[in-house]
């Protein structure tokens, strides 16, 4: 036997929605976090998506260092993440090596660190807090490439 859901008329539905919207307001901390997250978006950027990185042969533990790779159509961002004393160190390389004047920004929810790339496309940041991060590559004359947000746990 098939059960059919009880039909609800439009007036009852609207009354229920009004009742629900007034009785459970969104907490201020949730609204503040949503505004902060919205402020971190880069609408003109190309998003580099994560790509699986195999654990190198001969490695006994996949815990340290952690390797991540992100790719967009024309760019790859490779990251090596290590943790020490509750803080995070991040070393990375952008390939193919962008032209001189290219900057990377390592963004967390609370701070942004900027670095110029070395001639071989490498960069490093030490002492980051654990948590969510994203890397933005800003190349002169091109739209930025941004990695998806990734969570680092020490």
Spans of features found by a protein language model:
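Positively biased amphipathic helices and basic secretion/translocation or surface-docking motifs
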Residues: 1-61
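Beta-strand-rich domain onsets/edges
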Residues: 35-89, 95-99, 151-154
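Glycine-centered tight beta-turn/hairpin loop motif at sheet-sheet or coil-to-beta transitions
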Residues: 72-76, 110, 141-142
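Exposed beta-strand and adjacent loop surfaces of beta-rich binding modules
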Residues: 89, 101-103, 132
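Short amphipathic beta-strand segments in non-cytosolic proteins
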Residues: 98-114
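Conserved structural position at the C-terminal beta-strand
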Residues: 137-139
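Edge beta-strands of extracellular beta-sandwich domains
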Residues: 142-154
């Amino acid at each position: 036997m098939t059960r059919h859901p009880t039909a609800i008329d439009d007036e009852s539905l609207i009354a229920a929605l009004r009742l629900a919207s007034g009785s459970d307001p969104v907490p201020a901390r949730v609204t503040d976090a949503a505004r902060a997250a919205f402020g971190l978006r880069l609408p003109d950027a190309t998003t580099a998506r994560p790509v699986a990185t195999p654990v190198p042969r001969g490695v006994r533990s996949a815990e340290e260092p952690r390797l991540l790779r992100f790719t967009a159509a024309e760019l790859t961002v490779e990251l090596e993440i290590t943790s020490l004393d509750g803080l995070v160190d991040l070393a990375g390389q952008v390939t193919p090596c962008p032209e001189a004047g290219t900057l990377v920004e390592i963004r967390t929810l609370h701070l942004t660190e900027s670095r110029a790339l070395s001639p071989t496309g490498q960069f490093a940041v030490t002492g980051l807090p654990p948590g969510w991060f994203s890397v933005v590559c800003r190349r002169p004359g091109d739209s930025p490439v941004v990695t998806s947000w990734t969570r680092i746990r020490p």
